[in-house]
Amino acid sequence: MHAIVVCGSKQYLVHENDTFFVEKLEAPVGKEIQLDKVLMLDEKIGAPYLEKARVVCVVEKHGLQRKVNVIKHISQKHHLKKYGHRQPYTKLKVVRFVHD
């Protein structure tokens, strides 16, 4: 089984017992969450979402992605600005698909 779900503003193709990374969610590690914005479940396609369809996931961990370094340089002004950014994420594991 597979599904396409919306979490945040992104779409993810997920399979059963699959792990995937989403933008940071405010949920403790080990908590079971339900993603109810399901665009597609197997061959059923929603308009835009499927009614009464959910993907049940467990929060495995929170973390930070690899650092992205940014350098801004203005030529002939002797100006150099350097900073970095690490985007937070949440790792989810799909437990089951529910469709009533």
Curated annotation (Swiss-Prot):
Signal sequence region: none
GO annotation (BP), single: translation
Pfam families: Ribosomal_L21p
Species of origin: Mycoplasma pneumoniae (strain ATCC 29342 / M129 / Subtype 1)
Keyword Ubl conjugation: no
Family stated for the protein in its record: Belongs to the bacterial ribosomal protein bL21 family.
Lineage: Bacteria, Bacillati, Mycoplasmatota, Mycoplasmoidales, Mycoplasmoidaceae
Name of the protein in question: Large ribosomal subunit protein bL21
Subunit structure: Part of the 50S ribosomal subunit. Contacts protein L20.
HAMAP family, per database record: Ribosomal_bL21 (MF_01363)
Function according to Swiss-Prot or TrEMBL: This protein binds to 23S rRNA in the presence of protein L20.
PANTHER family xref list: 50S RIBOSOMAL PROTEIN L21, LARGE RIBOSOMAL SUBUNIT PROTEIN BL21M
GO (cellular component) term, any one: ribonucleoprotein complex
UniProt keywords, alphabetically: Ribonucleoprotein, Ribosomal protein, RNA-binding, rRNA-binding
GO molecular function, one term: structural constituent of ribosome
